[in-house]
């Protein structure tokens, strides 16, 4: 079983990482190509391209200018400790022990617009580049065309190393579109998290994002290898609802009323 999650826009490069262990991203040559494209953009270009404020555009133009190899602990940080946001609050990696972090390093991958695929302990320099950004590049008109089969091939490589044929999709639609489903050598299980509101079960974005991180944490704490075990996920009141689920879409519901 291999899990995938999305990255986050918010980053933390101030808090020291919980562990010293790190790895290097596998696709940095591809990342460098994108950095070259981004460095040709003015702050105004970036603001329009990403629909962000002038202040954020200036911040990220500076990040692209500063981006350089080699990645070290002095100029980069492990991805799972650098990303913030709802998913990562649910995962709360800084409070996980070494065995659980080791589990995530093997069985969790972070999809990224700039880095393609990251392991949790891969060093990462700060950036903003969402997968849905329409950044024209030497391979096409957007990042989906840039990454092509590369992301899928990397996931297949890890699935083969694990000797397993199930990918658990905890990523957003925007990011999972970078995975070529037909080329993926695995069944895709997609957990769906719903909360009861006004008498109906609905996907509430904040809670659903947090729950994705909670599920990854739950699996890491238990060393889950068989995806069927994920049906036992019960963090923060969620429970598997067999009647609302099918073979590949697993619905977890919670009553908050």
From Swiss-Prot:
- Tell me one Pfam family matched here: H2O2_YaaD
**Single Gene Ontology BP annotation:** response to hydroperoxide
Q: Which domain of life is it from?
A: Bacteria
Q: Name one GO cellular component term.
A: cytosol
Question: What PANTHER family does its record include?
Answer: PEROXIDE STRESS RESISTANCE PROTEIN YAAA, PEROXIDE STRESS RESPONSE PROTEIN YAAA
Question: HAMAP family from the xrefs?
Answer: UPF0246
Q: What family, per the record? A: Belongs to the UPF0246 family.
Q: What is this protein called?
A: UPF0246 protein CV_1250
Species whose genome carries this gene: Chromobacterium violaceum (strain ATCC 12472 / DSM 30191 / JCM 1249 / CCUG 213 / NBRC 12614 / NCIMB 9131 / NCTC 9757 / MK)
